[in-house]
């Protein structure tokens, strides 16, 4: 591909998520413009100018950092149109390019003081606490400026490495150190805040700690051993990924592209903005104030308070509400942080990446389809014509019914008989997939042969309900059409409902009749205790075949539980305990009749069976006839 405009495909095997180093974060946001100017750092909390409605320079929507807000137009308007592609305006410094770059170009905020990443500090488990082998409460005391931590005990005999000291305790020790009679030469070093945490993490030699832990694990057991293994696992993962523990303390914060946190003007001149902009603004304001305080050498207590506020602002940006008070906006609504956008059912992954809308799919309520075979489903005509429209259009043109796509679509809208006939031809042998959420195992999505039905509900065979965990009280199912021949073949061979009789989890049948099917089968074959058994030859209760019984039942000449004599020449298994027939007689033509409790057989002179009549109920005839039909058509 020589043309640079053509997109090249990047083939990759996997996506790896690791900790980002400060240099990597700056790489994401920092760019060198064609004129050599380096841009990327967001230094101002402003978003847009409310007079000109244009983004403020070096602000959260800066066109120099993120790209122009209008295609092929710089900020000041000197350069317009595509012919100036790639030029950097000498007046405003904006590169002339497409506005869609604002969807992927990032910026960054350089922090005046390090801050701890709230995920690794307050997550479960707390990786910072595990790595430092300190209680989470102690680590929090350090980060949020409540306690000092000893970074180097020096010559002081009462201090230990990583020991916590309150403000008063440290003041007492300072008095000792700087007293005239003090013998301490090597002064102890203490720290507070995320800077101290970063120092502690930098001091960790992962390989040495891992080696020591392995030795300790061999000589320990119980709770202590479990704790050591937990710490070793975290350290081994850091070593394997090449990440450094001090990267869990942030020096640089990435600013996501402006089109992913938009600001839109409403009717009446007011603006609606993403919550992220407010959270970023808090961080920038506090960061700038801290930088100014450090510049003018403000008292330590004021600087420390500003550092704590910066830490809380970054916490709220990354995960609002994880620690401390939740930051709220107008009408006391908690602001949506980066974590809130990513996590949960409505988050970016589950809602937008995994839960994308797909073409050639539909959704409707399911109802029972008792006349369907197990591998079939009833698909409403209205849905089928929409789902299979490309196939129908192709066939209509191929059969010279219409000349072009437009004419075919008009014909389809009228839903003529001709179109329905073509649709029937298209769906014959074209499986569709039915899915019921939640798809908890592979049988939650299965393939079926569609049968066109009237109405707007999908018809489903009752036997496949346990696999989908479906019932008919208003459940909905999604329909998907496999397009490629390979997909259709796979659906037919592997996913057809009649090929998925056993549960993949237990190996036991998942296609089992239940509830109304069992009750119906019982009711159909039940014997009525007070029903009288007719004599053989009674014209109203003797039939020449199973079909005659069913016709008589359909005409309401006999009831479901009435006893009937029906001719049936097949094998009969009965529980007749009599060794001898109730009655046996030989007729004048040499044929012999044997009367049993539930059957009457007639044999010729040589003992061959001529005819057999069975005494049974109409319901049992219906059941038997249904099974014979099902087996014959399988």
From Swiss-Prot:
Its EC number is 2.7.7.6. Keywords: DNA-directed RNA polymerase, Magnesium, Metal-binding, Nucleotidyltransferase, Transcription, Transferase, Zinc. Binds 1 Mg(2+) ion per subunit. Binds 1 Zn(2+) ion per subunit. Mg(2+) binds at residues 471, 473, 475. GO terms for cellular component: DNA-directed RNA polymerase complex. The gene is rpoC1. It catalyses: RNA(n) + a ribonucleoside 5'-triphosphate = RNA(n+1) + diphosphate. The lineage of its organism: Bacteria, Bacillati, Cyanobacteriota, Cyanophyceae, Synechococcales. Zn(2+) binds at residues 74, 76, 89, 92. Its cofactor is Mg(2+); Zn(2+). It is an enzyme of class 2 (transferase). It comes from Synechococcus sp. (strain CC9902). HAMAP family: RNApol_bact_RpoC1. GO terms for biological process: DNA-templated transcription. NCBIfam families: PRK02625.1, rpoC1_cyan. In cyanobacteria the RNAP catalytic core is composed of 2 alpha, 1 beta, 1 beta', 1 gamma and 1 omega subunit. When a sigma factor is associated with the core the holoenzyme is formed, which can initiate transcription. This is DNA-directed RNA polymerase subunit gamma.
């Amino acid at each position: 591909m020589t043309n640079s405009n053509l997109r090249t495909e990047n083939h990759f095997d996997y996506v790896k998520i690791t900790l980002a180093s400060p240099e990597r974060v700056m790489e994401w946001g920092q760019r060198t413009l064609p004129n050599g100017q380096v841009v990327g750092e967001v230094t101002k909390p402003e978003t847009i100018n409310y007079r000109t409605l244009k983004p403020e320079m070096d602000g959260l929507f800066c066109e120099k950092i993120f790209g122009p807000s209008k295609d092929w137009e710089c900020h000041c308007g000197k350069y317009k149109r595509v012919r100036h592609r790639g030029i950097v305006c000498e007046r405003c410094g904006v590169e002339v390019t497409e506005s869609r770059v604002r969807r992927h170009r990032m910026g960054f905020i350089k922090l005046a003081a390090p801050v701890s990443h709230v995920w690794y500090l307050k997550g479960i488990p707390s990786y910072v606490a595990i790595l430092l082998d300190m209680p989470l409460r102690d680590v929090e005391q350090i980060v949020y400026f409540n306690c000092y931590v000893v970074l180097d005990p020096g010559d002081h005999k009462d201090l230990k490495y990583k020991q916590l000291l309150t403000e008063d305790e440290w003041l007492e020790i300072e008095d000792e150190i700087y007293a005239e009679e003090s013998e301490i030469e090597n002064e102890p070093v203490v720290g507070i805040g995320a800077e101290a945490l970063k120092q502690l993490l930098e001091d960790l030699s992962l390989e040495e700690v891992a080696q020591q832990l392995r030795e300790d694990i061999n000589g320990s057991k119980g709770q202590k051993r479990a704790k050591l293994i937990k710490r070793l696992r975290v350290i081994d993962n850091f070593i394997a990924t090449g990440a450094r523990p001090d990267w869990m303390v942030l020096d640089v914060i990435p600013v996501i592209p402006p089109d992913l946190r938009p600001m839109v003007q409403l009717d009446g001149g007011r603006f609606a903005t993403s919550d992220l902009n407010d959270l970023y603004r808090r961080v920038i304001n506090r960061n700038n104030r801290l930088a100014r305080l450090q510049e003018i050498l403000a008292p330590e207590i004021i600087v420390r308070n500003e550092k704590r506020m910066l830490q809380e602002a970054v916490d709220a940006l990354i995960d609002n509400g994880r620690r401390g008070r939740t930051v709220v906006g107008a009408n006391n609504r908690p602001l949506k942080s980066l974590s809130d956008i990513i996590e949960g059912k409505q988050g970016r992954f589950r809602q937008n990446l995994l839960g994308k809308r797909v073409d050639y799919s539909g959704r409707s309520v399911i109802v029972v389809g008792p006349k369907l075979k197990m591998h079939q489903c009833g698909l409403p005509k209205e849905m089928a014509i929409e789902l299979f429209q490309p196939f129908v259009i192709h066939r209509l043109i191929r059969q010279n019914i219409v000349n072009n796509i437009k004419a075919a679509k008009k014909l389809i809208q009228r839903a003529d008989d001709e179109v329905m006939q073509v649709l029937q031809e298209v769906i014959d042998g074209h499986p569709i997939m039915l899915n019921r959420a939640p798809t908890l195992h592979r049988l939650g999505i299965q393939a079926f042969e569609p049968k066109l039905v009237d109405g707007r509900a999908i018809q489903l065979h009752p036997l496949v309900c346990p696999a989908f965990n479906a019932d008919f009280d208003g459940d909905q199912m999604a329909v998907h059409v496999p397009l490629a021949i390979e997909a259709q073949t796979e659906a037919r061979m592997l996913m057809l409902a009649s090929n998925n009789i056993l549960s993949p989890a237990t190996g036991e049948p998942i296609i089992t009749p239940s509830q109304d099917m069992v009750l119906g089968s019982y009711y159909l074959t039940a014997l009525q205790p007070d029903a009288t058994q007719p004599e053989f030859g009674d014209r109203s209760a003797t039939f020449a075949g199973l079909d005659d019984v069913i016709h008589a039942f359909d005409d309401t000449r006999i009831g479901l539980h009435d006893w009937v004599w029906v001719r049936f020449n097949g094998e009969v298994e009965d529980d007749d305990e009599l060794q001898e027939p109730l009655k046996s007689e030989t007729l004048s033509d040499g044929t012999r009749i044997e009367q049993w409790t539930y059957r009457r057989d007639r044999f010729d002179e040589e003992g061959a069976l001529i005819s057999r009549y069975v005494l049974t109920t109409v319901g049992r005839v219906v059941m038997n006839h249904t099974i014979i039909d099902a087996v014959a058509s399988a």
